[in-house]
Amino acid sequence: MQSFELEEMALFLIRDADEAEMWIDRWAVSYPIVQTAEADSRQTISEWQHEIQTAFDHIVSKNIAVVAHGVGVSAFLAWLYQADIMTQKRLTNIILVSPRPEALPEDEIHTFQRVRCPCRTALVIAETNGTPRGWAQEQAECWHARLLQSPHSGKLNGALGGWQWGMKLMQEMLLSQ
């Protein structure tokens, strides 16, 4: 990416509505161009798709970095599955953090088994007490993501020191393109 493309890039943050304030909220006020969305575990796949599309429609930047957490991962992937190729081309990188296995409902078209990420993607889980590693590895392979472990524990839903580790990961992903 050229430097001017990085300057105009939007950060699309999709948070888990079931979580209290955390690092993703700090990112929302720390980045110049941000669009946010929330996903609730009680919503259906079609409601997630509508919610994410509504937020996505407000993004004018040509280049978009996506960061989703918890149920937000499910909502984003449900939306991505039905997104057209021109929309997918706007995605520069994706970071999926602590997806919840129970928040990936099976549907008649197998959305979460068929979706593929079209750009550099990291699936980030905690080193301990979080998303099961074996399950996460299978999902990473299915979604064309690279599985990474955060040096933290649990659902990665705290302040995490502003989550500098994640910002560094995003920067490395963008600059390596």
Locate predicted features.
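Active-site catalytic motif of lipid deacylating hydrolases and related acyltransferases
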Residues: 2-64, 152-154
